[in-house]
């Protein structure tokens, strides 16, 4: 047996020895060449390099090709700043002048461009922007007396610091100012204001006009409910939806807090752009428009009337309405209401569609219903307009401080029920199968785009207002206090924002389910 195994081993060895030795050659890997990239790795403003301007080191934000710093002083920059930085593989120049970290002083009152260049010639540009205080624009109001009335204007001026955020041609604007609002003026210490410029002026990228509004948002602790609704309205094409900008307001040297600067609701080429009537427009086509009306239970305008369904309409424009004009628009509104409640209301030719622009009514409805706006169910700030030879439209939307769950005394506090749909005219429209079908189609068109964008808007605005809300609630320490008619008191700004966002998430999901049944 041993001989047998030995023989097998001998044979195997012989066979192995007969094989040709094979050498496998591998190709050498090419050397890894590092990309010739250049970048800032850090940028900061050191207190010791900038005495009298900043009191502690500020680390600048670097996002893509943008560098941003916010200096917590309210005054505009008046001195150059020394910038301290580190880079990857590069030298830094500004307008072909070498910049030395921690030594070169730079005028940063306006954004500057830094150019980084590598040894091999690769370049990259960064835009460096320095803002002051909270980073948002500041309005410095100077008045020739205290502003204590909604009726009497006080003369003065506004100096505008766009804070390197918007283009602003006129930086100092003569004006008149007075109070505005109803409960927001009478009940709250942070007051809203109406501004009337001596001459038309553009504001922070918004088209030129004379009349502007500063909304205080005192009872809206997110500070953004109105802004969110305005932007939603603009995205879905709601008629003449207002533009707006967050601003800090300083009046006569006193900081008043965060405000929303927006347009006055008025007939104007950059606002409600319809024909402006005169006292001579009393017959023919000229008598048919344009009219701007508000459904307002307060009935505190010079010209107003009440329909058979007890809806009070006030006439906003023309301001000096002639008897013929008042008679015409009163009849048109009543004819509209009669058509809505007639037996043939759903007739596409002779029913309500003869009098109203259905798409305009739908877009207005979606804005108000999604955020469940307390006052928009037959109470106030419900605007209509009628252009010359045109139908009745709804808009612009307005007044959203009591929306998105910010009310404790009505069904508007519940995210899971209809509210605007039950208004006098709307409830009748929704009885029409054809109208409900259009509502469903329109909802499906905007649901994944404009509606979904609301949540990103909330997040973006919360980030944008991070420093502003801190200053606002330092001035007005109410986060842990009940302010009429808050549904919740959460004691924290982030929780207030989360509450509003959650309300809208629940609400939109509920609307999804309801409209799916149409």
Name every feature range the model reports, one short phrase each.
Residues 156-216:
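Conserved oxyanion/phosphate-binding beta-strand-loop segments in alpha/beta enzyme cores
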Residues 173, 184, 188, 316-378, ...:
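Middle-to-C-terminal accessory/interaction subdomains
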Residues 90-94, 236-248:
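Short, well-structured beta-strand/strand-turn elements
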Residues 1-5, 19-20:
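Positively charged n-region of N-terminal signal peptides that target proteins for export
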Residues 19-136, 141:
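Beta-rich interaction/scaffold domains
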Residues 196-202, 216-217, 238-242, 254-366:
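Internal "kinase-insert"/substrate-recognition segments embedded within catalytic cores
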Residues 14-17:
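C-terminal motif of bacterial Sec signal peptides marking the signal peptidase cleavage site
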Residues 130-168:
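N-terminal module-boundary/linker segments of secreted carbohydrate-active enzymes
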